[in-house]
Amino acid sequence: PSAGHGALSAPLSDFTVMIEQASIFTAGPPLVKASLGEDITKEELGGPEIALHSGVIHNLARNDESALEQIRTWLSYLPSSAWQVPTRLADAEGKRKVNEILDIIPENPRQAYDMHDVINAVADSGSVFTIQPMFGQSLITCFARLSGRPVAIVANQPQHMAGSITVEAADKATQFIQVADSFHLPLIFLTDNPGVLAGSSSEKAGILRHAGRMFLAQHHATVPKIQVTLRKAYGFGSTAMGMNPFDGQTLNLAFPGVSFGAMPAKGADDATGADQETRKALREAELSSGYRSASSLSIDDIIDPSDTRNMLLQGLEIASSR
């Protein structure tokens, strides 16, 4: 167990691993019992089920050996210090088509899919290392390699709350982006979300403050940034994911048929009480928004999904030549 001052090192660390038998808390069960009258075990107070879902700990390991292996893997993506650049592996995979993306992403824009499948298809084989998989699950944060080059990926997860940016997801992304920027890892944003999570519970939790901090983290990041919109990006959800051109990113891409806007057309027509003709016009505008955005230079290119990996590699090459 870790308690008190020792436990504070976990939320202040760049990466933390916890084994299945461990626990972490502000104060242990005896003190909790004496001060609050709450009778609780150390597992119930700060075991893996609590610490991982609260975001205090990043990853879970079976035992000490597994924990050390995860730490070595995490460090393998980083340079030896913050004053160096990450090492690019020699003899790594080069350009290739990723035709499987066409099968992974459903034609129905309201149907969920696993963004992990997209990431694994695009990245070098076996190179993906997911960080904080049990916290803020509507966003995926992971390290990976593209043609041997370490990158940091932030991706919406449509399987969880449609990929909405929640308070927990924003907190996770903020810390992850700051670490990536500190160690010069290019940031890849894979966007497919209906926006920042709305609703009374989300507002009470301070979603605007947390999403705003996520935006500031990615806006202040000085590493190369490449954004790909896969299906949709609405409202502040697109800005937080680095889509807007004033953000200074290296490359801004989108798949055919993507939808952009302040909100989905369905929400816009309901909010304004639009008549049927206006509703139809809003739907048509939504379907063509990707090409209109591309023509106004906010999107650099509408790409064939099977070219995603190759376009990411091209963006990294552009960045390295600057």
Predicted regions span which residues?
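Ligand-binding clefts of soluble mixed alpha/beta catalytic domains
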Residues: P1-R322
